[in-house]
C-alpha cells in the first residue's frame, strides 16, 4: 500500500533567512485543516497576481483579495470584485462581490454577496516569519439571504495586503494568506 506523504509544515521549515535568500516574492497560505505551503509569483502577473505552489496549485489575488484558486479543493473558479486598489477606497459604501464555484455537474454556481468594509483606526504591528510590519486592519462583512462571511485584511501604508484571512469555499473554509516577501 502507498504510504500517505507526510505533510510538510512550512511554519517549521521556512525561516526569514530562507525567505530573503530566495530573492523572489513568496506567499504563505494555510487552510483551516492546517495544511500549508509557500507559493511563488507566476511570471507575467499584472493587476491580478497568480501564485504557484510546488505541487501545481494556484491562487490568484487582486491586491491580496482572493479571486480564484486551482488545486485547493472546491475551487473558486473566479470572482468579480470592486475595481479599487485599496480597501480604504471602499469604506462607507456597500458593494457587491460575486464568487463563482462549479457544481458537481460542472454548472456555474454564483455566490452573490453584499459587502461592507470597515477599518480599525489604530495601526498595529504584525510579525510574519520574524519580520514586523506596521499595518491597518480591515474587516469585511459579506452576506446573501442565507449566508454570511467575514474576511480580515492587514494592509501596510502603501495599501499592500500583507496578511489576510479570507473565505475560500464551504468545504475549505477560510484561508490564512501571508505575504512573505
Set out the residue ranges of the language-model regions.
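Surface-exposed beta-loop interaction hotspot
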Residues: 79-81, 86-89
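Acidic, serine/threonine-rich low-complexity disordered tracts
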Residues: 1-60, 65-73, 92-181
Amino acid at each position: 500500500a502507498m504510504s500517505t506523504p507526510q505533510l510538510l509544515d512550512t511554519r517549521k521549515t521556512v525561516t526569514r533567512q530562507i525567505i530573503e535568500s530566495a530573492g523572489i516574492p513568496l506567499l504563505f497560505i494555510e487552510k483551516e485543516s492546517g495544511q500549508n505551503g509557500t507559493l511563488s509569483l507566476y511570471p507575467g502577473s499584472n493587476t491580478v497576481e497568480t501564485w504557484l505552489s510546488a505541487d501545481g496549485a494556484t491562487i490568484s489575488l487582486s491586491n491580496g483579495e482572493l479571486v480564484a484558486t486551482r488545486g485547493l479543493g472546491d475551487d473558486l473558479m473566479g470572482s468579480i470584485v470592486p475595481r479599487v486598489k485599496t480597501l480604504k477606497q471602499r469604506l462607507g459604501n456597500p458593494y457587491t462581490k460575486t464568487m463563482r464555484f462549479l457544481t458537481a455537474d460542472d454548472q456555474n454556481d454564483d455566490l452573490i454577496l453584499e459587502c461592507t468594509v470597515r477599518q480599525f483606526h489604530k495601526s498595529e504591528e504584525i510579525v510574519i516569519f520574524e519580520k514586523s510590519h506596521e499595518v491597518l486592519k480591515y474587516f469585511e462583512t459579506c452576506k446573501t439571504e442565507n449566508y454570511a462571511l467575514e474576511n480580515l485584511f492587514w494592509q501596510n501604508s502603501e495599501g499592500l495586503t500583507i496578511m489576510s484571512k479570507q473565505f475560500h469555499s464551504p468545504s475549505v473554509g477560510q484561508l490564512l494568506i501571508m505575504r512573505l516577501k
